[in-house]
A protein has these predicted regions:
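Hydrophobic, Leu/Ile/Phe/Ala-enriched alpha-helical segments that form helix-helix packing faces
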Residues: 1-2, 113-120
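PAS/PAS-like sensory domains
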Residues: 11, 122-125
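C-terminal active-site "lid" helix and adjoining low-complexity regulatory extension at the edge
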Residues: 90-108, 118-122, 131-182
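Intrinsically disordered, low-complexity Ser/Thr/Pro/Gly-rich regulatory segments
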Residues: 68-98, 109, 113
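A short local loop/turn or secondary-structure capping micro-motif enriched for an aromatic residue
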Residues: 52-57, 87-88, 147-150
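Phosphate-binding site of ATP-dependent enzymes
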Residues: 1-82
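Short, surface-exposed charged micro-motifs
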Residues: 35, 128-130
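Short, positively charged
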Residues: 10-12, 107-110
Length: 182
């Protein structure tokens, strides 16, 4: 069929993701998303984005979601912000700490992110990955300009990490993941 402007209509269909039990207490309505920034086939920074009541169940920081930094070596959450930079330590309205959450499938998530960057031919990207209760990690989208709020969530700048891996020759995905975790 065609649209009113006589151009073909396009629709995307995807499976409905099921929320893992781990995230039920800290996600409002929607599915949490792990954003991994990859440069030069090396994952350099990551955050967990949690949907909130303020963001109406969307994992979008600009709309009021929570961004939680992730330790690259362990896949464990560290520091957190809400919205555009308000520092928080607990899930709003609860006593649940945001630090110390162990992200399941961490190595696989990093591997998927590096492989997506290799296939895309983008020098720098943000891979958005959700975890389905039954199927594990699923790539939602790749972002050529993924935004910089990941730095606020991690209380750390990207520039130093990017400079550290610029020009490093990465022949295998495994090596890129290993360097990203060091």
């Amino acid at each position: 069929s065609s649209s009113l402007s006589n151009t073909p209509d396009i629709a995307f269909f995807s499976a409905r993701l099921k929320l893992p039990k781990l995230f039920k207490p800290c996600a409002y309505k929607g599915i949490p998303v792990i954003r991994v920034h990859v440069f030069n086939r090396i994952p350099v920074m990551a955050m967990l984005r949690l949907p909130t009541k303020a963001s109406d169940g969307k994992a979008n920081l600009q709309q009021g979601a929570i961004g939680v930094g992730i330790d690259m070596a362990t896949g464990t959450t560290t520091t957190a912000i809400m919205g555009k930079g308000q520092i928080i330590e607990k899930v709003p309205g609860t006593e649940l700490p945001l630090s110390g959450i162990k992200i399941p499938y961490w190595k696989q998530i990093l591997t998927m992110s590096v492989e997506a960057q290799s296939i895309s031919s983008l020098g720098f990207l943000g891979a958005d990955i959700a975890i389905d209760r039954d199927h594990g990690p699923v790539i939602l989208e790749l972002n050529a300009r993924p935004g910089l709020s990941i730095q606020l969530a991690n209380f750390s700048g990207l520039k130093e990490r990017l400079d550290r891996v610029r020009g490093v020759m990465i022949k295998t995905t495994e090596r890129g993941v290993r360097l990203g975790r060091n």
